[in-house]
Amino acid sequence: MDESSLEHKYKLLQRQYDFCKIKADTVTQRIKAIEDVSAALFVEWESELNEYSNRSLKARSRQQLKLSQQHYARLIKAMQRAEARISPVLMAFKDQVLYLKHNLNAQAIAAIEHEFIEISLDMSQLIQAMEMTIAEASQFVASLSEQKALPGY
């Protein structure tokens, strides 16, 4: 797979992962909100039972409360089981996205290694040119020294 295709696939999967992560977080928040609202509803219902003057209505309301709490408990457990399955799937998805990203990183390192080889060659040529220039300068300085040493100048 060529680099641009790999990068395109990575970016696409990363966007999809981000979207799924947001959706998973939203599910968690909604379940929490349902739990909070339900808890408040049941507390209020329980406290209002004492406001009944009619025993029969109070008993029926208490029975309805009990049935509603049981129904709620089944529903919330089902939601929590579904939510618990989200995390492993999301983690496996993230693993795949990270692996793809790291393949891109490996390709980038390979490109850097190629660049290093080119820079090394350029540096070798530069050092060679500098050594030649230094040698020429040394010869020139030596010739100047010889001219000073010659008598009559």
Where are these regions (language model features)?
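N-terminal Sec/ER secretory leader and immediately downstream segment
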Residues: M1-Q29, I34
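Extended amphipathic alpha-helical interaction segments
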Residues: R30-A110
